[in-house]
């Protein structure tokens, strides 16, 4: 099973990177592949509570690849890191199958809280260059995070997110409209004038009522 997964990781490189030309080249020169293999070993040790040895392997891998994956992170099959330099994946991160990330991506936490504090990335997601996905949030199945985006909230399935902070611009193949009907927005100044006008009318009515009572006396 383990060796079949390693072979699958190599095949994933050929599927994702048109620049890959031979098994020899991929095995010896792809730092993303090296980082994934090192993580698979470190994670197996981590699950067996060999924490120090797992962290040691993780740190050696980081030194040689420029990719930091905590051994506690759970990563599925056919995970692909393209270019890789600067990728950081936190301890409680959960990554599904067929996920792709590019250089400079951070799947990190937002504080010092304990427990689940890193993102969950579902199957077939893609996270582009320099994107930051932070906190215990979920990036939905088949979703895409644009380059340089900062995502702090859950992303629905089959969505595209861009910007800082990240916002959904496409969902289920359809553009998400942003409400720019400024004429329909509330006008606080006009609302205040209407309130004052109503108070004046009420005061006039009260004065008229008192005048009538005085005249009757």
From Swiss-Prot:
Which keywords label this protein? Acyltransferase, Amino-acid biosynthesis, Cysteine biosynthesis, Cytoplasm, Repeat, Transferase
Q: Which GO terms describe its molecular function?
A: serine O-acetyltransferase activity
* Catalytic reaction(s) noted: L-serine + acetyl-CoA = O-acetyl-L-serine + CoA
InterPro entries this protein is in?
Hexapep, Hexapep_transf_CS, LbH_SAT, Ser_AcTrfase_N_sf, Ser_O-AcTrfase, Serine_acetyltransferase, Trimer_LpxA-like_sf
**Enzyme class of the recorded protein, top EC level:** transferase
In terms of SUPFAM superfamilies, this protein maps to:
Trimeric LpxA-like enzymes
Lineage, top-rank taxon, reads Bacteria
**According to its UniProt record, where is this protein mainly located?**
cytoplasm
Name the Pfam families on file. Answer: Hexapep (PF00132)
Which segments cross the bilayer?
none
Per UniProt, subcellular location reads as: Cytoplasm
Protein role: Catalyzes the acetylation of serine by acetyl-CoA to produce O-acetylserine (OAS).
Protein name as annotated? Serine acetyltransferase
Organism, by scientific name, is Bacillus subtilis (strain 168)
What lineage does the source organism belong to? Bacteria, Bacillati, Bacillota, Bacilli, Bacillales
């Amino acid at each position: 099973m383990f060796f079949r997964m390693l072979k699958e990781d190599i095949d994933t490189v050929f599927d994702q990177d048109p620049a890959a030309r031979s098994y020899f080249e991929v095995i010896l020169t792809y730092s993303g592949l090296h980082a994934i293999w090192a993580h698979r070993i470190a994670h197996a040790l981590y699950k067996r509570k060999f924490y120090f040895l797992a962290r040691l392997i993780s740190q050696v891998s980081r030194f040689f690849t420029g990719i930091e994956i905590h051994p506690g992170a759970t990563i599925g099959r056919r995970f692909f890191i393209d270019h890789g330099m600067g990728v950081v994946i936190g301890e409680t991160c959960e990554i599904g199958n067929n996920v792709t990330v590019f250089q400079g991506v951070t799947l990190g936490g937002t504080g010092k809280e304990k427990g689940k504090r890193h993102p969950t990335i579902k199957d077939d997601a893609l996270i582009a260059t320099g994107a930051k996905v932070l906190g215990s949030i979920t990036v939905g199945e088949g979703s895409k995070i644009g380059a340089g985006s900062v995502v702090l909230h859950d992303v629905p399935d089959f969505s595209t997110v861009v910007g800082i902070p990240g916002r959904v611009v496409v969902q289920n193949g359809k553009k998400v409209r942003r409400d720019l009907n400024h004429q329909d927005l509330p006008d606080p100044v006009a609302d205040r004038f209407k309130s004052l006008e109503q108070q004046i009318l009420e005061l006039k009515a009260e004065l008229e009522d008192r005048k009538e009572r005085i005249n009757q006396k």
